[in-house]
Every structure is written in structure tokens, then in C-alpha cells.
């Protein structure tokens, strides 16, 4: 119905926060860790804002590539609330803008080489796959192998559709609903069996399952399982 009413939002304030790999880098930096970030942004306003905010936090951005003609992945979220309940807002709408295609072979190889150059000074590698064409299978597996040869642990947050990229990682992160979905696909009797199957298939050292209010569960390649419940702070 072309005459149907549409929501009209009054914008009271707005803020810009780096997400994805930049968010992880800022989180690690806030813990006092020295971070070497390797990713890419587009040659647009959003890309410039991300680099500026990272630099303002003291994070080295020399490994952040700017790709001409590419849009920076941007998520615009609109929150709303009643005037009497301003402290209880909820998301009304999310609009996404950004690339879905993989980087060109040359840019991808350059990004991988940039990350490789930081291995010798690293105590751990964190790979986070957002399925937006930046972390390729070849690049991820090359980094995992090089880190393994150097005795550097690799922690990875994989996409369910790209688990092959995480083969050989020391630890992978999963949301509990993601493991539940894979449990059904694998026709496993429970999540523990699904975790064991996945760990063996992809040669992971461990799988950490994030269960929200239920805490976290660590499944290890040696069969050991550890559960840590949430605690009130």
C-alpha cells in the first residue's frame, strides 16, 4: 500500500564507533596490549573516520590498507525509545552498506604479506572473518601455517559458511546458536558431539562457545571440557 504510514524518526544524537576488526583491535588495546592491525577500508569518509579513531587510541594503522573504489563496510543502526523511557532504547532499523566481493588477488596478497611481516613480533594472532571479501581462504590458511611454524597461537572467529578458512587454528569462537545450527546439520546427538566432530574435522585445538547469560564452554581437542558460568559483577 503506497499510502501506508511510515515511521518518522527525530534524531537527537549520533555517534560513530569502529566495528569488526577495528573493534577487536580497540578492545585489545584497552587491555594494555600492543596491537598490529591488518585490514582494509574504502577510500571514503567512513574509512577515514575509522583510521582517525584508531590513531586517536594510539593504535598503529600502517597495516590498514585503503582500497580505491571500495566502500567501507558500514552499519547504521537507528534506536528509539519513549520519552519517558530514554534509558530503555531498542533498535528500530539497521541499514548496511559495503562490499560483498573479495579483494583483488594483488590487494589480498599484499594484505597477507603485511600481516606476515608482523608475525615475529607477535605473541598471538586473531583472525576474524566477517565474510566481506577481506579474509580469503588462501590468506587465512597461509597465516595459520606460518603462525604454527613459529609457535604462535591463532585464535579465530569464523563464519559458519567459511570454516575451511579456520583449519588448523588453535582456538575458534562460536556463538551457541551457531553451534546449535551445526549440530543439526551434522545430526549430532548433542552440542558436545558436534564440537568434537568439528574439532577433529578442522584440526582445531579448542572451541570456545559463547552462551550469553549461560556462560562459556571450552571444548578441547584432547576431549576435556570446561564450563564457566556467568557471574554478577
Task: Describe the role of every protein-language-model region.
Residues 1-9, 85-101, 123, 174-181:
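Gly-rich Lys/Arg/Thr-decorated short loops/hinges at beta-loop-alpha junctions or inter-strand turns
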Residues 66-70, 75-118:
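Conserved phosphate-binding/catalytic loop of the ribokinase/pfkB sugar-kinase fold
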Residues 1-36, 228-233:
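Glycine-rich phosphate/adenosyl-contacting loop at the front of the ribokinase-like
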Residues 132-226:
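Conserved phosphate/ATP/ADP-binding segment of small-molecule kinases
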Residues 41-57:
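A glycine-rich beta-to-alpha transition motif near the start of alpha/beta enzyme domains, typified by
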Residues 119-134:
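Short acidic, glycine-rich surface-loop motifs adjacent to enzyme active sites
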Residues 53-69:
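A glycine-rich helix N-cap at a beta->alpha junction
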